[in-house]
Structures are given as structure tokens and as C-alpha cells.
UniProtKB/Swiss-Prot annotation:
Family statement: Belongs to the ATP:guanido phosphotransferase family.
Keyword Transmembrane among record annotations: no
Name under which the protein is recorded: Creatine kinase M-type
Domain of life: Eukaryota
Residues reported to bind ATP: S128, S129, R130, V131, R132, H191, R236, R292, R320, G321, T322, G323, G324, V325
Organism (species): Oryctolagus cuniculus (Rabbit)
Catalytic activity: creatine + ATP = N-phosphocreatine + ADP + H(+)
List of residues that carry Phosphothreonine: T166, T180, T313, T322
GO molecular function, one term: creatine kinase activity
Residue span(s) of domain Phosphagen kinase C-terminal: 125-367
Length: 381
């Protein structure tokens, strides 16, 4: 799929209604918000780095969405996108993040000691635990918009920072372009590496340009702390391990992430953050904490229960298939994670996962014995 809004200035030769995209068959947040009037109002605006409204919406125009899955349908190209195009982004953010208003403030809490429990999820059911987030480096444009030189500068800065980590975080960087096909596939299968850029969302937004130039993965020596460089975000920071010790996974996540943040600050490149949106990331769905705390959990009986979906909704959790977004569950193993990102803290979001998964495992055990779980259905969180 070709990408390029290089003729944005040229588009202004045509009337706004002649350029307005056909969104009649679309089911995404952008299409819900973008009226012809709003398009007209914003189409000649651009951010200081030159990102325009057409750049913001292209991925949502090319990917109408799914009848049952509401995609976001837009991206930011730089930190200023959320301000310059706030008339589009604010209603999308409010819709996507449970009514989070333009006046609301986000809260951050990376003190792992505030998490209660989490070290006792039953490993017979909980096969692995992971926490991830994204970070954007101030002073650079985001992946949908950055140039080759800029992307390489982000990689250089990131590798220098990561290579200075010590102790349990000591590790090594592996650039994508020097990996063999086999090495890449092995890392993807082990859930360590991002997939090749075949996702239409990635392609249509321009994030896959120049692939695999300046992309790579850094991980510590025992592969429990990983950083992806220059995929959908400048950095994706991941803490993971087999089994159900979410407490330890979250501790390593918080400690490692704060170490990295400190190094970037000292280098004069703090992460993009503001008190309204929290951590600023490429996709509006990740604003706030950018955090997804997830477990792979085996729920052979509960997943067939008529109230499974309702239970997840009430616990503020979401399910994905075993291989992540848009994949099926293999052997009744689901990827269960927090549904929220914005308006609540990292600790609160992981707490919901820990408490919710614990309850679902108890339910699964009851159903195995042929007992009813009706008295265990939780109230809406």
C-alpha cells in the first residue's frame, strides 16, 4: 500500500468538499468525528514540522475498520499534533477513553510497591505475564512522520542510553537489518520481537517507511526486559517472564523504565509528557500510561460461559487471542489485559489485571468441578 501525503499543499487547490474523504462505510473513531465542516476548518493547518490533517487521518481513511471492532483511525505525527488538531483529537480521546474530557488531568504512578499482591497468580492457569508501554523522545517527530536521518538519530540516542544500563538490566542491541530471516522469525515466535510491517494500520500511516532501517530490539541478558526501537513508537519498553508473578514483572518494568527515563533526561531528551494526556504516543489509544499489562491465561471453561464477555467488561479487562491483536485463542489460552490507558495510573491498571485474573482463575476452577459461578459475577468496576 503506497503512502504519501506529499501533495498536501497542492490539495488546497481543490475545494474542501472536493477533497473530503468518503467515510460512508467507516467504523472508526475518526470517521465518527470528522464532519465536512471540521475537515474544512483544519485542512490548511499544519504542525511546526509540517504534519497536516490529511496525514493524521490517512490510516483511518484507508482502513474503514471492522463492523464489531472500533479502531481509532488516526495518528499523531509529532507532539504538537494533539494541540494543532485538538478539535479532531479531543472528541476521539473522549470517546475512546471513557469520557476523558479536554479539562481532565492524567495521573502517573510508577512506584511498584503500591501494587497489592500479584505474586500468587496460579501458574497452572497463568502461563506468562508481561507489562509494556511506549515512550516518545522529545525533540523528534513520531514514526508516521520522521525522516530517515531523524529515525537513525533516535536509534543512536536510544542504543547509547540502553547500553549504559547495568546489573539485571545489562544487555545488547540487535539491529533488524543485520538479522537473518530465521533469527527474526524465532524472535517473533517467542513474542520478543514486533512482527514485520504487514499491518495495514502501520503501512497506511507511514510508520513502515524505509523498513527495516534504524529499527531493532534491545534486551537484557536473560530476555526479561526488552525495548523495541522505532516501531509504532520511538520506544516500546517490555518486561516479561513465564508464569504468574506479575508483581516481579511490574517491579522490573517500573525500575527499568525509570532508569531509562533518567538517562534520556540527562542527555537533554526527556520523554514527551503533559499533565492532560500523560505520556504522548503515536496512537491516541495509547495516551496516558501507554501501558498494557497482560497475562496469557488458560480458561477452557470460563471462555465458553455465556457471561464471559460481560465479566471482562465489568472487570475493565479486554481479551485478545494467543498471538495478540486479531488472532485466535489457541488451546483456550487468552491474552487478558487492562482496557484503560488514560485517566488512571500504571499501578491502578495493573491492579485491575491482577485482581481480575485472580477472580477469573477461581471461576475457572469452580466450573471445572461443575459448580455455578453466578454468585461470583463481579459488579462493574
Amino acid at each position: 500500500m503506497p503512502f504519501g501525503n506529499t501533495h498536501n499543499k497542492y490539495k488546497l487547490n481543490y475545494k474542501s468538499e472536493e477533497e473530503y474523504p468518503d467515510l460512508s462505510k467507516h467504523n472508526n473513531h475518526m470517521a465518527k468525528v470528522l464532519t465536512p465542516d471540521l475537515y474544512k476548518k483544519l485542512r490548511d493547518k499544519e504542525t511546526p514540522s509540517g504534519f497536516t490533517l490529511d496525514d493524521v487521518i490517512q490510516t483511518g481513511v484507508d482502513n474503514p475498520g471492522h463492523p464489531f471492532i472500533m479502531t481509532v483511525g488516526c495518528v499523531a505525527g509529532d507532539e504538537e499534533s494533539y494541540t494543532v488538531f485538538k478539535d479532531l483529537f479531543d472528541p476521539i480521546i473522549q470517546d475512546r477513553h471513557g469520557g476523558f474530557k479536554p479539562t481532565d488531568k492524567h495521573k502517573t504512578d510508577l512506584n511498584h510497591e503500591n501494587l497489592k499482591g500479584g505474586d500468587d497468580l496460579d501458574p497452572h492457569y497463568v502461563l506468562s505475564s508481561r507489562v509494556r508501554t511506549g515512550r516518545s523522545i522529545k525533540g523528534y517527530t513520531l514514526p508516521p512522520h520522521c525522516s530517515r536521518g531523524e529515525r537513525r538519530a533516535v536509534e543512536k540516542l536510544s542504543v547509547e542510553a540502553l547500553n549504559s544500563l547495568t546489573g539485571e538490566f545489562k544487555g545488547k542491541y540487535y539491529p533488524l537489518k543485520s538479522m537473518t530471516e530465521q533469527e527474526q522469525q524465532q524472535l517473533i515466535d517467542d513474542h520478543f520481537l514486533f512482527d514485520k510491517p504487514v499491518s495495514p494500520l502501520l503501512l497506511a500511516s507511514g510508520m513502515a517507511r524505509d523498513w527495516p532501517d534504524a529499527r531493532g530490539i534491545w534486551h537484557n541478558d536473560n530476555k526479561s526486559f526488552l525495548v523495541w526501537v522505532n516501531e509504532e513508537d520511538h520506544l516500546r519498553v517490555i518486561s516479561m517472564e513465564k508464569g504468574g508473578n506479575m508483581k516481579e514483572v511490574f517491579r522490573r518494568f517500573c525500575v527499568g523504565l525509570q532508569k531509562i527515563e533518567e538517562i534520556f533526561k540527562k542527555a537533554g531528551h526527556p520523554f514527551m509528557w503533559n499533565e492532560h494526556l500523560g505520556y504522548v504516543l503515536t496512537c491516541p489509544s495509547n495516551l496516558g500510561t501507554g501501558l498494557r499489562g497482560g497475562v496469557h491465561v488458560k480458561l477452557a471453561h470460563l471462555s465458553k460461559h455465556p457471561k464471559f464477555e460481560e465479566i471482562l467488561t465489568r472487570l475493565r479487562l479486554q481479551k485478545r487471542g494467543t498471538g495478540g491483536v486479531d488472532t485466535a485463542a489457541v488451546g483456550s489460552v487468552f491474552d487478558i489485559s487492562n482496557a484503560d490507558r488514560l485517566g488512571s495510573s500504571e499501578v491502578e491498571q495493573v491492579q485491575l489485571v491482577v485482581d481480575g485474573v485472580k477472580l477469573m482463575v477461581e471461576m475457572e476452577k469452580k466450573l471445572e468441578k461443575g459448580q455455578s459461578i453466578d454468585d461470583m459475577i463481579p459488579a462493574q468496576k
